[in-house]
Amino acid sequence: MDFKIFLFLTAIFMIVGVTVSTATTNPTAPRAYRPRINTTAGVCELEVPIVNILPPELKHTAHTIRGNGSAPGFSKIKICCSGYKIVAHTPFHCTPDCPSGCGLGNCTAPNVCTCNKGAGFGPDGKCISVCPGRCLNGQCYGNFCNCNSGFVLEPNGRYCTGGCTRNCGPGGQCVGNNQCSCLSGFALNSQGTCQMICAPGFQQMGSACEPLCPKGCVNGECVAPGQCRCKSGYALNSSKVCAPKCSQPCYNGFCSAPNVCTCKEGYIKDATSRNGNRCIAYCAAGCPNGTCSAPNFCICKQGYIKQSKGSNVCVKQ
């Protein structure tokens, strides 16, 4: 083989993925070959007879060329897979094809568009401008709401107003002629503004519907209509009120806070009580020769009697 022809063929076949040899081979008859997908996205390999990819002046040399195909006389070439189109030959690169175009978006897979931020799909599948709101009383152009004649764009840029002397509320829009249009979940009240619709047992609190507990939920929170959930250290009592809990009973007193006992009037804490949950009677003047058994009431020891009726002084009999 002429050396110049050898160099020319080598350059061509490096592009299509074949190698050149001076060995003589007999090409087999053309056969069907299923394209095989390569690891590169959208790039497939196709096996074809070498003679089909040679220029006319070199076809007579086909029998001297050994390809890299699965049979003598065949070679593998790179092509774009179905649904892809070529964008570069060196290096070989294919990109997804969307024949109808994507508008304000990019073709990310065969016939699949991904819209840019602020755009959405139109009826024809292309990406078009989408305004932040419904663009009421206006037209959406380039992701901006252009108001119809006689209407003015609201500061939030979502819709155009035609003049309302009153505020339609957070769930309403002015549609012109002093009329409010309410969004889903809102309804016109007697003042003509939009008010949130709350289910029975709920009330509007700011921008949400919250459950209603008619008696309130002191030391707890209202989690459902008429139902309180107590804070830690509290529990519902028989009156359905969140009352403090004490792990030990409060003798002659009451549980005033979680694990805190408060003595009743006329009683004081028993210094000998380990848990601080026992209260004992208090006698202001003390009980000489006796025991304070109730607030300001003494019982005399054996062999002693009250000095006088109503007295807390005990004397020997």
Swiss-Prot record:
Position of the signal peptide: 1-23
Domain EGF-like: 93-128, 130-161, 163-195, 208-243, 245-280, 282-315
UniProt cross-references to InterPro entries, sorted A to Z: EGF-like_dom (IPR000742), EGF-like_domain (IPR053255), FBN_EGF_N (IPR049388), Growth_fac_rcpt_cys_sf (IPR009030)
Keywords, sorted A to Z: Antibiotic, Antimicrobial, Disulfide bond, Immunity, Secreted, Signal
Family matches, as Pfam families: EGF_FBN_1st
Cellular compartments annotated: Secreted
Region (May be required for E.coli agglutination activity): 24-33
Gene Ontology CC terms, in alphabetical order: extracellular space
Superkingdom in the source lineage: Eukaryota
One example of a Gene Ontology biological process annotation: detection of lipopolysaccharide
Record-annotated disulphide pairs: C98-C107, C102-C113, C115-C127, C131-C140, C135-C145, C147-C160, C164-C174, C168-C180, C182-C194, C213-C222, C217-C228, C230-C242, C246-C255, C250-C261, C263-C279, C283-C292, C287-C298, C300-C314
SMART domains assigned: EGF (SM00181)
Transmembrane feature ranges: none
More about this protein: In mouse bone marrow-derived mast cells (BMMC), inhibits LPS-induced expression of the inflammatory cytokine Interleukin-6 (IL-6).
Role description: Binds to lipopolysaccharides (LPS) present on the cell walls of Gram-negative bacteria, behaving as a pattern recognition receptor (PRR). Induces bacterial aggregation and enhances their subsequent clearance by the innate immune response. Binds to the inner core oligosaccharides region of rough-type bacterial LPS. Displays activity against the Gram-negative bacterium E.coli. Does not display any activity against the Gram-positive bacterium S.aureus or the fungi C.albicans.
Name of the protein described by the UniProt record: Epidermal growth factor-like protein
Source organism (scientific name): Holotrichia diomphalia (Korean black chafer)
Origin organism lineage: Eukaryota, Metazoa, Ecdysozoa, Arthropoda, Hexapoda
Gene name, Swiss-Prot/TrEMBL: EGF-like
